Amino acid sequence: MALTKAELTDLLFENIGLNKREAKEIVECFYEEMRAALQNGDGVKLSGFGNFQLRTKPQRPGRNPKTGEEIPISARRVVTFHASQKLKSMVEANYRGESGTN
């Protein structure tokens, strides 16, 4: 199960005591700032969590699976995420049944 924006908003409401409108605005602002940074070609670094970066993929040959015809796949930019070592350690500790708190 994935954590959604609506669930994140509810968690801010429940745990911090913000009203629902304020919690929703904070979540939306956070997402918008991340989107804007990535659209401008900047990376997003969240300490202890990970990094979002843009990677440029060059044009490459592809193949239509139905016809077998070779077609070009356009160059594009993709967003990549690299988890921090701290996040990786916490996930691994949770998987092994350890406390995961460092």
Swiss-Prot record:
This is Integration host factor subunit alpha. The gene is ihfA. Residues 49-70 are annotated as: Disordered. This protein is one of the two subunits of integration host factor, a specific DNA-binding protein that functions in genetic recombination as well as in transcriptional and translational control. It holds the Pfam family Bac_DNA_binding. Heterodimer of an alpha and a beta chain. GO terms for cellular component: cytosol. Keywords: DNA recombination, DNA-binding, Transcription, Transcription regulation, Translation regulation. The keyword DNA-binding applies. GO terms for biological process: DNA recombination; positive regulation of metabolic process; regulation of DNA-templated transcription; regulation of translation. One of its GO terms (molecular function) is DNA binding.
